[in-house]
A protein has these predicted regions:
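A conserved hydrophobic secondary-structure block that centers on an alpha-helix together
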Residues: 169, 173-175, 180-183
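Ligand/cofactor pocket segment of small-molecule handling proteins
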Residues: 193
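N-terminal FAD-binding dinucleotide-binding subdomain shared by FAD-dependent oxidases/monooxygenases
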Residues: 2-11, 16-21, 25-156, 171-172, ...
Length: 533
């Protein structure tokens, strides 16, 4: 179906997570010749690599799943309210097998570079060998797929074993009888720490920045709830797409400070009792002003104090200096309770900074700690990391890395000026990581598929954003962020966890509803803001 016959494929997809698998199914269904390259030795994307104990999704299983095939969503039975990594991985394997996707996937094949040819209007993609040509190059490389290893003096000298949560060994790790240290208390660390504490002889947690976390209240999926969901899936999916977060939270349209204190606490209590992200929907201005945010942040701080028995440890676990939610809020199972165990020590690096890793453990400003195993729960080079590691060259020989040296710029998070027929799924400038990722992914994939169909039926070979449209969208993304408290935290949303990375707020805070409306308007106007040839 390709309009350009000078290439071997209509589309090459990079990445076999949720995005890549849905893209492959969708484009193949349109009669396109599509192939997918995946660096791992199985499908799953983020859920292939992140196998650490306790790894699980912070969106409920019935919502963190594909909606494109009703038989699939009816036949699959989730085990828990919040699915663990093995279950999500099994689900994605099932999707690949059920729809016979593997025949068009090359596993253990890392894309190293891609170059656009202006004369033939094709991309040549180099993946661990000879290049293949394609009309469209679609990056489904994920937002959290490149682990970040911190630059800590002496790290390479540690005599024990070191593991990163983002690249966990398939065979697992036995912590029984071991002295273990964990560096990092973001989402990965907060999930890992309670599991390690159950089996380790002793666990030392080296914490630089305390995190806000809410209880998941996870458990087996109630059969009656599952039946109700499956009987009403179309409406549930519709409500998710009609929600700013891509999942229904029961958002309250009141402002926090317009409500008396007692009523506000009652609202927070009700949502705390539901678990998960329900708390963030308590009032519509929680992420808009410091004053409103303080009401929910102080509520969570009080919950931490009430849970952790030792007052000094509790105060060290209290997040300070940034708004709740400005760094991704964590969803945990017994995280704060873990610090009541006798075999767990919290080291507050705000009081005594980490100076170095030693052969035997770690040295801070006032003490030394010995351990046998070191776990790095130090996050990812988010949103742009995977793209930075591929040498992508567009018009005039400009590389994507060079274009983005001052921060990522896109039009709608979908395309980049100067890089024709390069499409991004859940890219910077789209809601992506601020929403239910599967909802955001499905909207992007469907938009991209409709675009390719439009180009084929109208005889166009190439599409890329006009520079003016890209500049306008970047300005809009930045303006929207400035109306919120998000930029007030040194978060991975800002790229602040990567030394030397430009600090700009990368996702789009306007929400899924307004974003999808904008994307649809662009398409309805013949893809306004894009240049088609």
């Amino acid at each position: 179906m390709r309009t350009n016959t000078r290439c071997s494929h209509d589309a090459i997809i990079v990445g076999a997570g949720f995005s890549g698998l849905y893209l492959l199914w969708k484009l193949r269904g349109q009669g396109l010749n599509v192939h997918l390259f995946e660096a791992g030795d199985d499908v799953g994307g983020t859920w292939f690599w992140n196998r650490y104990p306790g790894a699980r999704c912070d969106v409920e299983s019935v919502d963190y799943s594909f909606s494109f095939d009703d038989e699939l969503q009816q036949e699959w039975k989730w085990k828990e309210r919040y699915p663990a990594q093995p279950e999500i991985f099994e689900y994605l394997q099932h999707v690949a097998d059920r729809f016979d996707l593997r025949r068009d996937i090359s596993l253990t094949t890392r894309v190293r570079s891609a170059r656009y040819d202006e004369d033939t209007r094709t991309w040549t993609v180099y993946a661990d060998g000879a290049g293949v040509t394609t009309q469209f190059l679609i990056m489904a490389t994920g937002c959290l797929s490149v682990p970040q290893t911190p630059n800590i003096p002496g790290l390479e000298c540690f005599a024990g074993r070191t593991y990163h949560t983002g690249d966990w060994p398939k065979e697992g790790v036995d912590f029984s009888g071991k002295r273990v240290a964990v560096i990092g208390t973001g989402s990965s660390g907060i999930q890992l720490i309670p599991e390690v504490a159950k089996v380790a002889e002793h666990l030392t947690v080296l914490q630089r920045t305390a995190s806000f976390s809410v209880p998941a209240l996870n458990g087996p999926l109630d059969p009656e709830f599952e039946r109700e969901v499956k009987a009403n899936y179309p409406e549930r999916r519709r409500r998710a797409r009609a929600s700013s977060a891509g999942v229904e939270r029961g958002d309250n349209e009141q402002n926090a400070l317009d409500v008396p204190y007692e009523d506000r606490v009652k609202e927070f209590d009700g949502r705390w009792g539901k678990g998960g992200f329900a708390l963030l929907g308590a009032y519509q201005d929680l992420m808009l002003t410091d004053e409103a945010n303080d009401t929910v942040a102080d509520y969570v701080r009080d919950k931490i104090r009430a849970t952790v028995e030792d007052p000094d440890t509790a105060e060290s676990l209290i997040p300070r200096g940034y708004p709740l939610g400005a760094k991704r809020i964590c969803v945990d199972t017994n995280y704060f309770e873990t610090y009541n165990r006798g075999n767990v020590t919290l080291v507050d690096l705000r009081k005594s900074p980490l100076e170095s890793i030693t052969p035997a453990g770690a040295r801070t400003g006032d003490a030394e700690y010995e351990f046998d195993v070191l776990c790095l729960a130090t996050g990812f080079d988010a949103m742009t990391g995977a793209l930075d590691r591929i040498d992508i060259t567009g018009v005039g020989g400009e590389t994507l890395k060079n274009k983005w040296q001052h921060g990522p710029t896109t039009y709608l998070g979908l395309g980049v000026a100067g890089f024709p027929n390069l499409l991004l799924i859940a890219g910077s400038g789209s809601p992506s990581v601020l929403a239910n990722m599967v909802t955001a992914i499905e909207q992007h994939v469907e938009w991209a598929a409709e675009l390719l169909g439009y180009m084929s039926s109208h005889g166009y070979d190439t599409i890329e954003p006009a520079q003016e449209a890209e500049d306008g969208w970047v300005a809009h993304v930045n303006e929207m962020a400035s109306y919120t408290v998000f930029p007030k935290a040194a978060s991975w949303y800002m790229g602040a966890n990567i030394p030397g990375k430009p600090q700009i707020f990368m996702p789009y805070v306007g929400g899924c509803v307004e974003y999808e409306k904008k994307c649809n308007e662009v398409a309805e106007k013949g893809y306004s803001g894009f240049v088609l040839r």
